[in-house]
Amino acid sequence: MKNNNFRLSAAGKLAAALAIILAASAGAYAAEIVAANGANGPGVSTAATGAQVVDIVAPNGNGLSHNQYQDFNVNQPGAVLNNSREAGLSQLAGQLGANPNLGGREASVILNEVIGRNPSLLHGQQEIFGMAADYVLANPNGISCQSCGFINTSHSSLVVGNPLVENGVLQGYSTFGNRNTLSLNGTLNAGGVLDLIAPKIDSRGEVIVQDFKQSNGKVTSAAINAISGLNRVARDGTVQASQQMPTALDSYYLGSMQAGRINIINTAQGSGVKLAGSLNAGDELKVKAYDIRSESRVDDASSNKNGGDNYQNYRGGIYVNDRSSSQTLTRTELKGKNISLVADNHAHLTATDIRGEDITLQGGKLTLDGQQLKQTQGHTDDRWFYSWQYDVTREREQLQQAGSTVAASGSAKLISTQEDVKLLGANVSADRALSVKAARDVHLAGLVEKDKSSERGYQRNHTSSLRTGRWSNSDESESLKASELRSEGELTLKAGRNVSTQGAKVHAQRDLTIDADNQIQVGVQKTANAKAVRDDKTSWGGIGGGDNKNNSNRREISHASELTSGGTLRLNGQQGVTITGSKARGQKGGEVTATHGGLRIDNALSTTVDKIDARTGTAFNITSSSHKADNSYQSSTASELKSDTNLTLVSHKDADVIGSQVASGGELSVESKTGNINVKAAERQQNIDEQKTALTVNGYAKEAGDKQYRAGLRIEHTRDSEKTTRTENSASSLSGGSVKLKAEKDVTFSGSKLVADKGDASVSGNKVSFLAADDKTASNTEQTKIGGGFYYTGGIDKLGSGVEAGYENNKTQAQSSKAITSGSDVKGNLTINARDKLTQQGAQHSVGGAYQENAAGVDHLAAADTASTTTTKTDVGVNIGANVDYSAVTRPVERAVGKAAKLDATGVINDIGGIGAPNVGLDIGAQGGSSEKRSSSSQAVVSSVQAGSIDINAKGEVRDQGTQYQASKGAVNLTADSHRSEAAANRQDEQSRDTRGSAGVRVYTTTGSDLTVDAKGEGGTQRSNSSASQAVTGSIDAANGINVNVKKDAIYQGTALNGGRGKTAVNAGGDIRLDQASDKQSESRSGFNVKASAKGGFTADSKNFGAGFGGGTHNGESSSSTAQVGNISGQQGVELKAGRDLTLQGTDVKSQGDVSLSAGNKVALQAAESTQTRKESKLSGNIDLGAGSSDSKEKTGGNLSAGGAFDIAKVNESATERQGATIASDGKVTLSANGKGDDALHLQGAKVSGGSAALEAKNGGILLESAKNEQHKDNWSLGIKANAKGGQTFNKDAGGKVDPNTGKDTHTLGAGLKVGVEQQDKTTHANTGITAGDVTLNSGKDTRLAGARVDADSVQGKVGGDLHVESRKDVENGVKVDVDAGLSHSNDPGSSITSKLSKVGTPRYAGKVKEKLEAGVNKVADATTDKYNSVARRLDPQQDTTGAVSFSKAEGKVTLPATPAGEKPQGPLWDRGARTVGGAVKDSITGPAGRQGHLKVNADVVNNNAVGEQSAIAGKNGVALQVGGQTQLTGGEIRSQQGKVELGGSQVSQQDVNGQRYQGGGRVDAAATVGGLLGGAAKQSVAGNVPFASGHASTQQADAKAGVFSGK
């Protein structure tokens, strides 16, 4: 047996205790009215007005009176019963008289039995006095009322046990084995009927019953019968038997009842009924029990103060405090006009208010719930004083709900009878009908409500920023409390298992029926909100730095569930129906069924989590900034199932719609019966998991190349990181204004949508899919930098300072993918049925009239959008500086001031002799490298069918991939067993690698009597790959034509058939292709490079050293292929019909009528190919050596050196381009072929126009070729450099020895060569023409034109063997050469031009600027040898013999003129080459740089080999053909020009072709000096050329001829 414990609030417990105490003490006071002993006792009297009086017994004769007692108590001066037979007054015993025991008979029942052993105690009132009767008090030893009542009653009974009386009648009451109590407390009053019959009722105050008028304006009414356990009752509280009990008694009603019928029964069996506070019935309110409990009243309140400037000491204190807490409620009201609470176990309503007009709540478990109340606040303050502190505490908590209210005013029934119906945040209403019925489940939830807040605290030295630490905040907020059902006309939820909605609100304003017998769950409740921040600080205790934090946030909310009607919405269940993100509507339509499983219209999801764990710092709390996080977001709620009329979803397993919305507004019907229809998308996710940190000091001002600069300061430490995962997509929709989907397995769209807003759409099943949906991102990102600092340098190559460091690391990985599509949008016709397979993937549709696909085949595909990236980089640094360099005097005076603004003067005397000197030193380097990059991408997404008719049926393949049909108002029909239209691509790839290097060292002075170390390094690796491919194509356009009709093959790839305003028909039965579509590209590179070097040093007086080495290799490769084509159009013509073969590849066929290409084996028209390729390869190297030494006190010597360097490069190019096909027409062009080979009609460079032409090939022949474009090059180049140096020098003595005849020897050699060769082979023709104005060539083998051209105004046909008209050629061979040589020698002395203009005064004044530039170049070569010996002694007269005197300070000597002797000098040739061009222009300005050089060569050659179009058969009103064997011609032509050429008698055979065209080349440039052959013959005569060679040639003659001309 179940025990129910009724929990009282603290106030309730106090009230109960007081009632017991009062009852006990009042019992002591009320021990009065005793009677009994014989003939049923009474007498008893007191009055004047301590009331009592009684007198009654006598009647029976069934006016019963039957009193007995031994005790019975009343007091507070009440009682009187008398029942009169006159005298008068009373209202508690004023005056009185009559009774003596009523021999003349009144009564009509007054019983009062007790018969000893106490309780009764009633503490006031009872009167009857004259006539009106019915009153019973029976006792077995309970009853205590306290303020009790009655007076002249019309039926009041309080019983607790016994009388039944039989033949003297009464016949009611017993309560069998009895366990006492009926206890009421304060105010009872009564009037018409009140029976409270016990074991156990304990009511606790106010029971007021009224109505009762009589004497005899009869009324009575107002009733209360509250009967509790053991029973056998009647008189007419009926019950008539029951027993069981030992233990569990319950029944208290805990304050107030009024009446106009209230009838509360508890007939034990686990007992029950406890209500609390007011039942009011203005007509009927019944409660029956084995449990029913209804609760309210929670009081509680509290507070707690302190303050008033609390204090402690020693030197510091204050602690403030306020606290509070409270709850209050007092509700429970049940009013009346038919309310019935029945429970035969449970029925539990907690914060109750139930009003009335029909309301039945039953039991066997039914719970409407609520209550929880708690409010509490807080506040503490805490402060302290020495070494300051300040604490704070704040709290707050509210959790509130209250729940339950059922208000009907016309029907509402909530029943369970055996288990469930719970409503929780309830509020049920109705204004005629609402019914919830269970016997397991029906759930509907709600409640929650919270609001918490907190703050903690503690700081210590507090502020002016001596802050110290600890803090904590929190904030939590949830709310909800829903659950509402409301009616105003019909609403039924019924279960038998399940129906559960959670964020409920269910409304109907007629019809809303939810039925179940397993399932229907219309979801979501969830709520949360939270926040937390922690703080941790420090300022001066962290010497000015601090901060940490520990943030958080969490937010889920979802709530929905709203089912609303306004007319029809029926959801049925029977093992299915789940709507989760909720809302379902009706407004006169709906019905969702799932009789035996399926249907789920999903989404909800809500998560937000943010965590961060920050930190700042600096100064000695260092860090300065960090941030972690652990983000996560999902959201989405959708699910809306609507109708503003018609919506039917039936299912018997499956039929999911997941991102949701299903609407209507006129028929939408979705069915499954048994299996599938899924219309998906939804998935939502985002995780990011960040880390950040930074410590930065900065500074800087940059550019540290070319003209140089840099500034400085930098400390850096950065570390970022991110992980990202993102998956979005939400869609899903099926709308209405007509849509029908039916399955019996399959029908899937995935990125979703099918709308049809006002007219047609239907999709059936066994596989139909429209697919896509992706949206993805995944990412890893990392960055690490470490850092370093200090710097300044300066400009145009150095000033100084240094120190740096480095390290950097970047990683990126990313993937992505987008696509989401699926489609349609209709508004008139769309029919897709497939009883196996129709799959579209990039689908979009949008219809607007017809578009139908019926299947067992059909694919349409594409869809992609994706991307991928991998980037990795690692770098190192290091640098140490100090400087002044002055880059060997500022880059030889910035390359001799732009080679003196390009007038050059031999590289402004070789950049002023390479200047040289300043330096101070130290640089140590190091760099780093490594990198990787990969990238990939792919777009495409196609499929699209816009419509206004398109019709595709298949029972075997139709597969497009670059699809897009569009047909806006008319045709495109395709019936199949094959048709395939491929293309679609868009891809790009890329890979790379980069590995670098470098090193350094430079230690220098010039001159701190010297030292040099120089060393270098370098590194290598590069690699790269790339690839690309576009194409996408596809399309069939139409507005009124195209009609493909296939039973095997018809394959297009560069597609686009148009059909505008009529016809384009393709009809296969084997083959028809239109191929090509390409766009490709590829590339690959590779690398390597290495270098090294070293240098050496010392002087006072010198040593040197050198070294070198080098590196190279590189590779290449490239490729491409473009073409695309496709296109065939309409305007009432074009028909292609095959039946095996018909291939166009360079397609583009137009029309304004007729064009028919047929086959039955082969018709070809090929070409279209485009391709290019290029290869490369490089190899290079160099080597340098060196040595040195010298000695001095005056000289010894040394030196060696060498050089090197070569590079070899090779490229190998190629190209092929052909295009071909294009047929135009403005009337007839028919090319037919019917097999039997020799190439049953085949055109290759085709063009064909129209206004008639028909080339057939009745069983073999016709070729008409060309189109061949090729090109090839085989380029290479070679470069060689060399060098050498030399040395030796002796002298010494005056004790330093070495002389051996005092050496010298010095040299500088050179060399050099560059050769570049480009070769080429080229072949070109394109021909095939046929232009028309009549042309017919039939063949039955042979007819072959090979380059081709038929022009026409007539040319007729039949060949039947031979007729070749050839021509072709076009060949070009190429060669193009460039050579650039060199040569040099020197024999040093600074390789003068006066030792390179004596290095403009440095190293240290360069021999006093080479003795003032060799004394004004020997005083301008002795005043130009005395004005060229006074103009060669006036143009010779045997010339004067007196020479000039010259002086050289450097050699300390005077040179006198030579004394003539012997023969006189030879005279003119003019004057011996103007005395060998001015002493070779004064030994090319004073001294060595002996022999220099150059030679440049260019050459071109082309070769050609001719024709360049001919081939012909022309026409202009003649040529009739009928050949039947031979005609040949080879150089071409058969012509007419206004008449004749017939060839019915054939033979003819002519040849001619020959050809030629040649071009030529030349050019050499020379010098190896005499002023660079006088300034490159004044720069090749200021670039009008010729001096020093040239050339060219040309040859033509091109022939082709051959013949038959007639009318010419």
Curated annotation (Swiss-Prot):
Annotated localization: Cell outer membrane
Keyword Membrane: yes
Chief location of this protein within or outside the cell: membrane
Sample GO molecular function, one term: catalytic activity
Secretion signal, residue range per the UniProt entry: 1-30
GO biological process: killing of cells of another organism
GO CC annotation, single: cell outer membrane
Span list, region Disordered: 296-315, 452-488, 716-737, 971-1030, 1168-1199, 1437-1469
Superkingdom of origin organism: Bacteria
UniProt keyword terms in alphabetical order: Cell outer membrane, Cytolysis, Hemolysis, Membrane, Signal, Toxin, Virulence
Composition bias, Basic and acidic residues: 478-488, 716-726, 977-996
Gene3D superfamilies: Single-stranded right-handed beta-helix, Pectin lyase-like (2.160.20.10)
Bias kind Polar residues: ranges: 303-313, 460-474, 727-736, 1021-1030
Pfam family, one: TPS
UniProt-listed SUPFAM superfamilies: Pectin lyase-like
Main function: Bacterial hemolysins are exotoxins that attack blood cell membranes and cause cell rupture by mechanisms not clearly defined.
UniProt protein name: Hemolysin
Designated gene of the protein: shlA
